[in-house]
Design a protein with these regions (language model features):
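Extended acidic/charged loop-beta regions that coordinate divalent cations
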Residues: 1-14
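Conserved core of the sugar-phosphate nucleotidyltransferase
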Residues: 3-5, 132-167
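Residue-level signal for inorganic ion chemistry
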Residues: 11, 29, 55, 112, ...
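Hydrophobic packing residues within well-ordered alpha-helices of enzyme cores
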Residues: 38, 62, 82-86, 140, ...
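Conserved N-terminal catalytic core of the sugar/cofactor nucleotidyltransferase
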Residues: 56-119
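Short aromatic/hydrophobic "clamp" motif used to bind/position activated sugar donors
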Residues: 121-123
């Protein structure tokens, strides 16, 4: 076998390996917040919206999307509730792990990233935001594959007023 043949063999193996790696897209859904601004004993991700907990809508969106699996990050006191009353009850089969969050959002993201080891691409979503769409998810996956990182934003629709502290 000549050098040219050997080079082609190595290159084709790399392409096959890379194609396998690209399949792994993990969604980390953060649901460890306390929702203190809501002035409620129930964190907003667990409040009922329509017939379901707010968190359900985010999990269902990722369940129905091209992501391969979901890591759910929640508070230590809510792990069993999430497992039994949301994931199992509503058959959210892509949830591979439920991990506890940290004191701050970045701690929860860190714990989710540790649990998502092996994922080539990671989407991070706040479980208290139920209006995520399939288009946003697929556009995010497409963008991260091109640019290595991306973020989602929507145009501001409400009036914004600047208030002078002294008035």
């Amino acid at each position: 076998m000549g050098d040219a043949d050997n080079a082609d063999y190595k290159e084709s193996n790399i392409e096959i390996f890379d194609a396998v790696d690209e399949v792994k897209v993990t969604a980390i859904v953060l649901a460890a917040g306390k929702g203190s601004r809501m002035h409620s004993d129930i964190p907003k991700q667990f409040m009922t919206l329509g017939d379901y907990p707010v968190l359900y809508y985010s999990l269902k969106a990722f369940q129905d999307s091209p992501v391969d699996d979901i890591i759910l990050v929640t508070g230590e006191d809510y792990v069993e509730y999430c497992r039994n009353d949301i994931v199992d009850r509503y058959n959210i089969t892509k949830v591979r792990k439920i991990v506890t969050g940290g004191a701050e959002r970045y701690d929860s993201v860190h714990n989710g990233l540790i649990a998502a080891n092996g994922a080539k691409y990671v989407l991070i979503h706040d479980g208290a935001r139920p209006c995520i769409t399939q288009k946003i998810i697929t556009d995010s996956i497409d963008a991260v594959k091109i640019y290595s990182a991306c973020t989602v934003g929507v145009p501001v629709k409400d009036t914004i007023k600047i208030v002078d502290e002294d008035q």
